[in-house]
A protein has these predicted regions:
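Conserved donor-nucleotide binding/catalytic region of nucleotide-linked donor-dependent transferases
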Residues: 1, 90-110, 127-131
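Acidic donor-binding loop of glycosyltransferase active sites
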Residues: 26-40, 53
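Short acidic alpha-helix that forms the nucleotide-activated donor recognition element
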Residues: 17-28, 50, 64, 68
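Nucleotide-activated donor-binding/catalytic signature segment of Leloir-type glycosyltransferases, i.e.
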Residues: 1-17
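C-terminal alpha-helical cap of glycosyltransferases
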Residues: 114-134
C-alpha cells in the first residue's frame, strides 16, 4: 500500500488482502495471467473460466495448450507489456468480445474435469498398448 501511495496510484488499486480466487474472480472484468516462464497447465486460467471471467494471458506454449486466441481467451506476446495492454484494452472496451470469451472459456473448462482427464489418459494408454479405444 505504501509503495502504491508513493507512486501515486493507490486510488487506482484495490488491495483486498487474502481472498479465495473463486470468491474474488466473479467481481473482476478479466483475469490477466502475464507469466513469462512456463508453468504447465495453468490452474489460474481454468479458475477464470470456472468463474465466468474472460482470460487474457501471455502466449507461452503451456497457455496456448488451453487458450485459443480470440476464441476462449486473448493471447499477448510473452514479455511484451504493450501487447498485454492492447489485449486488456480490447477486452475491456468490447463487451461482445468479453461476453464471448467468458462463454467459450466456461465451455472450455469442461474439457478439464477429473473424469474427462482420466478418460483421455485411459484412451492414450490403450492406444500406446495397441488396443484402440474400445
Amino acid at each position: 500500500k505504501e509503495e502504491a501511495r508513493n507512486l501515486g496510484v493507490d486510488a487506482l488499486l484495490a488491495l483486498p488482502g487474502r481472498r479465495d480466487s473463486v470468491d474474488m474472480l466473479p467481481d473482476c472484468d478479466a483475469l490477466v495471467v502475464p507469466s513469462v516462464d512456463g508453468e504447465g497447465s495453468s490452474g489460474a486460467i481454468k479458475e477464470g473460466w470456472v468463474t465466468g471471467v474472460p482470460v487474457i494471458c501471455s502466449a507461452l506454449a503451456s497457455n496456448q495448450e488451453l487458450v485459443r486466441g480470440d476464441e476462449n481467451g486473448l493471447l499477448a506476446a510473452v514479455g511484451d507489456p504493450v501487447s498485454l495492454a492492447d489485449a486488456m484494452a480490447r477486452c475491456l472496451t468490447d463487451e461482445g468480445l468479453r461476453v464471448r470469451l467468458a462463454e467459450e472459456g466456461s465451455r472450455s473448462v469442461l474439457e478439464f474435469t477429473d473424469t474427462r482427464m482420466a478418460e483421455q489418459y485411459m484412451d492414450l494408454y490403450r492406444r500406446l498398448m495397441g488396443k484402440g479405444t474400445e
